[in-house]
Structures are given as C-alpha cells and as structure tokens.
Design a protein with these regions (language model features):
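An N-cap/entry alpha-helix motif that binds or orients negatively charged groups
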Residues: 1-69, 178-236
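Glycine-rich active-site/cofactor-binding loop and its immediate structural neighborhood
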Residues: 72-111, 116
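Alpha/beta enzyme core
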Residues: 83, 97, 118, 122, ...
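A gly/proline- and charged-residue-enriched helix-loop-helix capping module
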Residues: 101-122, 126-140
C-alpha cells in the first residue's frame, strides 16, 4: 500500500501501522485506559445526520471562515500534535507546508520537534502555539516570548493535562521520547528498517522549545505520562491562566474546555477563544 492508494482515514491508519514500529504507531493511535472516550469520539461522527437543501446553485462553493481574526480557506485547521518527527522525518515541516497549501492555520505543540522560529520562516499563513504550563517559570516565559517573536497569531494554553494519562498501550510497548530499544520493542523496530534509517540519518531528534531547560524527552528517555506528571505544574489555576493571557497580549485560547461554566470563566479572564476538547481521550477516559 502507498499514499496513492489511500482514499480515506482508515487507509491512512492502515498504512501508518505498516510503516511505523509498534511503539510509535500505538503512541499516536492509542488513548487512556480502556479507550472508551477515544472510541466514542470516533463513533460520534456516525451519529450525525446531514439533511441537505437542494437547488441552491453550487457551481461556486466557499468554505472559508474567520478564526481569531484570520480568514481561512477551510473551516478546520491542523491541531497541535507533539513529537511529529517520530511519525515522519519531515515532521512539522511537512504539516506546516500542507496547512499553507490549503490556507488554513497550523497548530504547533510545545513538544514539537521543529522550532517556532523555523516554522515562522517556512510558512506565512496563520499559526497557533500550544503551550503547557511547566513548573519551570523560565521555560514558560521562554515559550511565550519565542512564539511572540516568531509572530505566532494565537496562544493556546492546554488545561486538561495536569497529569499524564494512563496510556496502557504505551506501557505495553515501552514507548518513550526519544525512542529506546527494549526487549519488548526490539523486534518491532528491527522489522521497520526504513523508519530506523530515516530516524538516524535525517537530523538529530530534539524538542527545541524545551531542551535548554529540561533533559527529559530529548537527551533523557521518558514516557509522555511521566513527563506530564513530573514537569507540568499541577497547581495551575485560573489566576495563572489570566496572567498568561495578559502576558501574551494577543489572541489567547484555553484548550480542553468541556463545561459551560469553564467557557464563561475563560471569557471573564480575557480569552478570545476556547478549544472544546477532551484531548482525544488520551488524558482522561
């Protein structure tokens, strides 16, 4: 199977499963605990009925919309995803170029494998930076200032990841960042030689927004759950979010809002948007 034979989401998923070592595939494909939330997220699309109105003249269709004051040609954008270079050696560079091709916004994770500076030099379409609130205040300030200097349009503070999700697939496969060989994963990596060749020859794996402050994730192997549980500030509250919103001074969103009450609080502290999300069921099942 190749890309030209992929015609829907399931085709792409099957191709990824064939191309990626098991720990890498199950990290991106999996979720927390029994994955009930994850499966409900997927099946929910089957519950949506579309009732089209006809005879409207569709020779010219406009899908554009405005988000955070930016006009996008599509009514959706690329949400931030961590560690993209693990899935393909071009990582965020490829996704950013795709977002620019279709004139939509590109979300960059704090755990990205390409820096905000490089992304800014690569594309000129709208960009969002997703931010995790770390215990290290110097790291927090650095992330905000670098994104601001790189002229990112939106800052999104993730608020549903106070601790790491219990991702049972990762426990079974031994997934870490950066990847390491274990007895459980050795065979899987050995049977995907092209992934290994690309990983070793296409530039060093690094987390450029974090590596000057923490070793974990770049030079020291760690699970994502352990990283979140030890590095993120579990005392984060509404006062912290309000200060960050003021410090950013531009479009600011909270990512992970699930209740009307919290949505109203987000408006009260100055947010210009919210991202209604359960993190794909990857944090709380």
């Amino acid at each position: 199977m190749s890309l030209k034979n992929c015609h829907n989401f399931q085709d792409f998923r099957n191709l990824a499963k064939r191309k990626l070592p098991s720990p890498i595939f199950h990290y991106i494909d999996g979720a927390a605990d029994d994955e009930i939330t994850y499966n409900r997220n997927t099946s929910a699309f089957n519950d949506v009925d579309l009732v089209p109105n006809v005879l409207r003249g569709v020779e010219s269709v406009d899908l554009s919309t405005t988000i955070f004051g930016k006009k996008l040609d599509l009514p959706f954008y690329c949400s931030p995803t961590a560690l993209q270079r693990l899935f393909h050696y071009d990582g965020e560079r490829a996704v950013g170029k795709a977002a620019q091709k279709f004139n939509t916004m590109f979300g960059v994770s704090a755990l990205a494998t390409v820096s905000v500076e490089e992304i800014s030099s690569l594309i000129d379409t709208p960009k969002l930076f997703q931010f995790y609130f770390h215990k290290d205040r110097g790291l927090n300030d650095s992330c905000l200032e670098r994104a601001k200097a790189a002229k990112f349009d939106v800052m999104a503070l993730t608020v549903d990841t106070i601790t790491g999700g219990n991702r049972e697939r990762d426990l079974r496969t031994g997934f870490t960042s950066p990847p390491k060989l274990t007895l459980a994963s050795l065979f899987s990596f050995a049977t995907k030689p092209m992934w290994g060749i690309n990983y070793l020859t296409k530039g060093k794996f690094e987390l450029p927004h974090l590596q000057d402050y923490v070793e974990e994730g770049t030079s020291t192997n760690t699970s994502i759950g352990n990283y979140f549980s030890t590095m993120l500030d579990q005392s984060m509250n509404w006062n912290d979010a309000e200060k960050l919103c003021s410090q950013w001074g531009g479009h600011f969103a909270l990512k992970g809002i699930m209740s009307v009450e919290d949505a109203k609080k987000a408006v009260d502290i100055g947010c210009t948007g919210i991202m209604v999300s359960n993190h794909g069921g990857r944090q709380l099942d």
